[in-house]
């Protein structure tokens, strides 16, 4: 599967601040898709609409630290 690179090259840093315990399976899968599975983990991701949608879905469990 070929992934397209973002045109602008912008990135977003996301940190997990909440536990997925007592949350739905979809929210757990979304965290896993973002590369987060333990508290205080940080990931630098491409700033795309898909990533923004995933962040919005679990906005109560993550914090956006930096947007470049």
Curated annotation (Swiss-Prot):
What terms describe the molecular function in GO for this protein? structural constituent of ribosome
Q: Is the Transcription regulation keyword given for this protein?
A: no
Quaternary structure note? Part of the 50S ribosomal subunit.
Q: Please give the coiled-coil regions recorded for this protein.
A: none
Q: Which UniProt keywords apply?
A: Ribonucleoprotein, Ribosomal protein
**Record-stated family:** Belongs to the universal ribosomal protein uL30 family.
Species whose genome carries this gene: Bartonella tribocorum (strain CIP 105476 / IBS 506)
Give the top-rank taxon of the lineage listed in the UniProt record for this protein.
Answer: Bacteria
The answer to whether keyword Ribosomal protein applies is yes
Signal sequence, start to end: none
List the NCBIfam families: rpmD_bact
Quote the cellular component terms of the Gene Ontology held in the record.
large ribosomal subunit
Supply the InterPro entries for this chain.
Ribo_uL30_ferredoxin-like_sf (IPR036919), Ribosomal_uL30_bac-type (IPR005996), Ribosomal_uL30_ferredoxin-like (IPR016082)
Protein name (database record): Large ribosomal subunit protein uL30
Swiss-Prot/TrEMBL GO biological process terms: translation
